[in-house]
A protein has these predicted regions:
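Small-residue-rich beta-alpha loop regions that form the catalytic core of phosphotransfer
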Residues: 2-93
Length: 93
């Protein structure tokens, strides 16, 4: 049985950079839910858009993100540019 694939985009500087201390727990939750998770930390403005547009077509079943409203905005903007629309999840930082 193949596992569903998730791209998890996160901003390591969001929320007073506390995501780093919770990252493994979040990935563990997704893994237990049946996902093979690829974690992608953003480094600069626009990285979320670029990651979604370049990495998701035909490969991932879902995109999740964690960060502030800018991270969520970038992921949704990237998804709107893709022909195939995937479910998007959000974990506030």
């Amino acid at each position: 049985m193949s596992r569903r694939k998730m791209l998890f985009i996160y901003n390591p500087r969001a929320g007073k950079a506390q995501i780093r201390s919770n990252l493994l727990d979040m990935i563990d939750v997704f893994t237990r839910a049946g996902y093979e998770v690829t974690a992608y930390p953003t480094q600069a403005r626009g990285d979320g858009i670029k990651a979604v547009v370049e990495k998701t077509p035909g490969f991932y079943d879902m995109v999740a993100c964690s960060g502030g409203d800018g991270t969520l905005d970038e992921v949704v903007t990237g998804m709107m540019q893709c022909e195939e629309k995937l479910p998007v999840g959000y974990v506030p930082a």
